[in-house]
Amino acid sequence: MSGGRSPMEEAYARLRQVAEQQQKRGGFGGGGLPGGPRGAGMGLAGLVLLGGAAFVAQNALFNVDGGHRAIKYRRTTGVSKEIYAEGTHFVIPWFETPVTYDVRAKPRNVASLTGTKDLQMVNITCRVLSRPDIAALPQIYRTLGTDYDERVLPSIVNEVLKSVVAQFNASQLITQREMVAKLVRENLSRRAARFNILLDDVSLTHLAFSPEFTAAVEAKQVAQQEAQRAAFVVDKARQEKQAMVVKAQGEARSAELIGDAIKKSKAYVELKKIENARFIAQQMQESGSKNRLLLDSEGLGLNVFEDREKN
C-alpha cells in the first residue's frame, strides 16, 4: 500500500491506470474488444466491478473480541438465533448487521433512600456485579437492546431494596446486616433472571441513617454505659460492705478464741511476748546506729502480763 491508501483506493487507481493505457492503445488488445467509446465503457464497467468486489471483501468480515459475543440482524428474517463466539466471522454487507455484546461481569452501584419498619429513613447503596445470559442474547436484543443493564438494574434494585428494608427495624439493619444482604441477593437474583441477566455478586456497601437517628442512638449508648457504670459502683460497694462484715466477724471470733486460749493456757501469752520482743528488736535494728537505746526485758515488753499475774 502506497501513501497510506486503502486497498479499495489502490485497486481503483490500478484499474484507472489500466483503462487509460488501453485507451491509448485503442482497445483491449489484439483480437479483443474494439477500441473507442465501447472500449472505454468496458474499462469503466470493469473498474466498477473490481471496486464493488473490494468493498464486499472489506465489509464481509467482522471480528468478535475477547469477552464478547455477537448476533446478526438480517433485513429479511430479523434477529438470528445464532450466537458467534470470539474470532472472525463472515457477514453479508447491507443484508446482515452484526451486534456485539460484552458478556463480562460489570459492576454497578445503585443508591436508594428507603424507610425501615419503624419508619426511619436510611440511605443504602447496593453494588451489583452483572452480566447477560449468553444463550438469551437474541431475546435480550429484541426486548431490551444493547443497553439492557441501564434499562433494568436501577429499577429492580430500588424495588428490592425497599421491599427488604421495610421488613426490619433500623437497629436490625445493623445487627442483622448479613441476613438483610442475603434477602436482597436472593430476591434481586430472581428478578434479574426474568430479564435474562445473571448476577455474580450482590453486596450492601453503604448504610447511613438520618442525623437525628444517629444522635439518638449515641445518646442511648451513653445512657446504657452510665447505667452499667452505676450498677458496677453499687455492686462494688455491696461487696466491700460484705467484706467488712466478714472481716469484723472474723476479728470478733479471733478475739474470742484468743481469750479462751489465754484462760486455758499461759503458753499463748509467752508466745506473744516473744513475737513482740522480736518485732521491737527488728525495728530498732532497721533504724540504724543513731539514737540507739538499750532496753531490758521490761522495755522489750517481755513482762507485759507479769503485773497481772502478780495481782
Swiss-Prot record:
The chain crosses the membrane at residues 39-57. It comes from the Eukaryota. Gene3D superfamilies: Band 7 domain. One of its GO terms (biological process) is mitophagy. A motif (AIM) lies at residues 141-144. SMART domains: PHB (SM00244). The mitochondrial prohibitin complex consists of two subunits (PHB1 and PHB2). The subunits assemble into a membrane-associated ring-shaped supercomplex of approximately 1 mDa. Interacts with ATG24/SNX4; the interaction is direct and plays a role in mitophagy. PANTHER family: PROHIBITIN, PROHIBITIN-2. Prohibitin probably acts as a holdase/unfoldase for the stabilization of newly synthesized mitochondrial proteins. Involved in mitophagy. Required for the switch to necrotrophic growth. This is Prohibitin-2. It comes from Colletotrichum higginsianum (strain IMI 349063) (Crucifer anthracnose fungus). The gene is PHB2.
